[in-house]
Amino acid sequence: MAEKKQWHETLHDQFGQYFAVDNVLYHEKTDHQDLIIFENAAFGRVMALDGVVQTTERDEFIYHEMMTHVPLLAHGHAKHVLIIGGGDGAMLREVTRHKNVESITMVEIDAGVVSFCRQYLPNHNAGSYDDPRFKLVIDDGVNFVNQTSQTFDVIISDCTDPIGPGESLFTSAFYEGCKRCLNPGGIFVAQNGVCFLQQEEAIDSHRKLSHYFSDVGFYQAAIPTYYGGIMTFAWATDNDALRHLSTEIIQARFLASGLKCRYYNPAIHTAAFALPQYLQDALASQPS
């Protein structure tokens, strides 16, 4: 039997992970990034950008449920949601499940990502691009949040790692723009890497966000594709009560929403804000 082709991730220099490639569905360099989608027997369809895995069919639900339902249920009455990035459509899919949300704006820098994900990752978007509340804007995320006249209750930054095009979504200019277009009491969340391997990323985000928001923290989830431990999500708001809501309050909102999830539940919601001591110590050691 012929040996299967392997695809190796290049995020770290000294170690990494690989996937057996059963079939390459798409591989092309766009104006902004090198994209590949291939099939793997264990993880289904896998999408990678610039040598780094972004999403797989097998475990994407963990990431997307935690990035959407945690801020939306903590907020309690979000009407207008902004997604930065998220071209695969799975973040949009989860937001559309909240029937009280009135508008969903998604800003994606690369129109090519949206078009090929609609074709090659249909399970990710599950038809959500056709939701009448949805509006797609092709623009740079930093430019959008600093120029738009719209305001939002929840902003979700579905950013790549802070390299290449994704680097700008970890800058003070981006965070300041998000604060600018966030309604009072609104919540900003962002992907912030696997903290055991990318601790400096979390520290840097915490320091920058603290200039614009009075309550900055992280919550976490374990996602197999993003190897190396727990993945952290940045959390920023000016309402510190939202991070400390009881499980009973979240439970009531969850039941009222009618959501059926595969990973998220109210107990996971409140527990996710408990962080490992090494991350707490690293954040506490930073100058104020």
Swiss-Prot record:
Catalytic function, reaction form: S-adenosyl 3-(methylsulfanyl)propylamine + putrescine = S-methyl-5'-thioadenosine + spermidine + H(+); S-adenosyl 3-(methylsulfanyl)propylamine + spermidine = spermine + S-methyl-5'-thioadenosine + H(+); cadaverine + S-adenosyl 3-(methylsulfanyl)propylamine = aminopropylcadaverine + S-methyl-5'-thioadenosine + H(+); S-adenosyl 3-(methylsulfanyl)propylamine + spermidine = thermospermine + S-methyl-5'-thioadenosine + H(+)
GO molecular function: cadaverine aminopropyltransferase activity; protein homodimerization activity; spermidine synthase activity; spermine synthase activity; thermospermine synthase activity
Consequence the record notes for mutating residue 158 to A: Completely inactive
Record's subunit section: Homodimer.
PROSITE patterns: PABS_1, PABS_2
List of residues binding S-methyl-5'-thioadenosine: 33, 108, 140-141, 165
Coiled-coil regions listed in the entry: none
Name of the protein in its database record: Polyamine aminopropyltransferase
Cellular component GO terms held in the UniProt record: cytosol
Reported impact of residue 162 to A: No influence on aminopropyltransferase activity
Subcellular location: Cytoplasm
Top-level taxon of origin: Bacteria
Task of the protein: Involved in the biosynthesis of polyamines which play a significant role in the structural and functional organization in the chromoid of E.coli by compacting DNA and neutralizing negative charges. Catalyzes the irreversible transfer (ping-pong mechanism) of a propylamine group from the amino donor S-adenosylmethioninamine (decarboxy-AdoMet) to putrescine (1,4-diaminobutane) to yield spermidine. Cadaverine (1,5-diaminopentane) and spermidine can also be used as the propylamine acceptor.
Protein source organism: Escherichia coli (strain K12)
Residue span(s) of domain PABS: 9-238
